[in-house]
């Protein structure tokens, strides 16, 4: 099996459409959605677009997918982490999805395992196999990698969540992040990955000015729309993003843990 991995779309339908054109040209067997799929300026249309692909799509739950379903149910609880969106943001998104969308998101698995050509068994999760909101960074200590994936047998793991692509060997396990389709850091365009027979980190360029304008038009009253559209036009630097996520990882770690 050869797959495309798309993570952190965050309701950016113009970016998704651009990536799907490249994915179609690549000729894959399946598309793995590695979490944080719909929340953002175009939540309903993004889910509808992906649903049109039918059984070709394999879905994995991200923290924002879980939070969006909870907001729809009226049970959302903020995490308190600076890098997670506030309740007002999820309330706006939840008002723009259907019951069927909610049921889809609420039923997504935390992890999926697939047999990939040339790589063997590969596990897919958004944060880690134990927590969809846990941050794995390219420079996280090896001890953090070991603990985060201890329950997995697969020698290769694909994660998302940090929006920054990397391919690292840690504690004998290959860990890959495809980056973000909808809200990348460090460069313009949309990041994703091809798996099989090896790993290729891909970037799709698209008209980010037109996309940002479309997002603003679709969601003028979405909390944080200025940040979201602005980041599509000119992405924050990877150094800025890494610093923010490193601080969040430090907040998440138990006292005396590896991220301290």
Role assignments for model-derived ranges:
Residues 1-3, 114-123, 170-174:
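Beta-strand-turn-beta hairpins that frame and shape the catalytic cleft
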Residues 75-84, 118-151:
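Active-site-proximal segments of metal-dependent phosphoesterases and phosphodiesterases across multiple
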Residues 10-15, 39-42, 64-69, 132, ...:
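Active-site environment of divalent metal-dependent phosphoester hydrolases
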Residues 2-102, 106:
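Core catalytic region of metal-dependent phosphoesterases/phosphodiesterases
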Residues 32, 58-60, 158, 174-176, ...:
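Hydrophobic/aromatic beta-strand patches that form the interior of the parallel beta-sheet core
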Residues 139-176:
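Anionic-ligand binding region
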Residues 23-27, 53, 116-118, 151-153, ...:
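Glycine-rich phosphate-binding loop signature in dinucleotide/nucleotide-binding domains
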């Amino acid at each position: 099996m050869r797959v495309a991995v798309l993570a952190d779309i965050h309701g950016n339908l113009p970016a998704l459409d651009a990536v799907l054109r490249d994915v179609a040209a690549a000729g894959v067997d399946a598309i793995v959605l590695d979490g944080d799929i719909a929340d953002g300026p175009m939540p309903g249309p993004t889910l509808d677009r992906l649903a049109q692909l039918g059984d070709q799509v394999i879905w994995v739950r991200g923290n924002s997918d879980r939070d969006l379903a909870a907001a729809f149910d009226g049970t959302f609880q903020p995490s308190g982490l600076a890098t997670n969106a506030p309740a007002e943001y999820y309330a706006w998104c939840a008002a723009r999805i259907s019951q069927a969308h909610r049921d889809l998101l609420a039923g997504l698995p935390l992890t999926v395992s697939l047999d990939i050509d040339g790589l063997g068994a590969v596990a897919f999760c958004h944060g880690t196999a134990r927590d969809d909101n846990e941050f794995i960074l390219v420079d996280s200590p090896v001890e953090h990698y070991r603990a985060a994936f201890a329950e997995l047998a697969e020698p290769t793991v694909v994660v998302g969540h940090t929006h920054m692509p990397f391919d690292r060997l840690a504690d004998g396990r290959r860990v890959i992040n495809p980056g973000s389709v909808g809200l990348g850091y460090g460069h313009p365009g949309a990041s994703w990955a091809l798996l099989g027979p090896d790993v290729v980190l891909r970037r799709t360029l698209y008209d980010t000015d037109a996309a940002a304008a479309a997002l603003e038009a679709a969601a003028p009253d979405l909390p944080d729309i200025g940040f979201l559209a602005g980041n599509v036009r000119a992405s924050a630097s990877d150094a800025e993003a890494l610093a923010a996520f490193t601080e969040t990882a430090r907040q998440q770690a138990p006292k005396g843990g590896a991220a301290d």
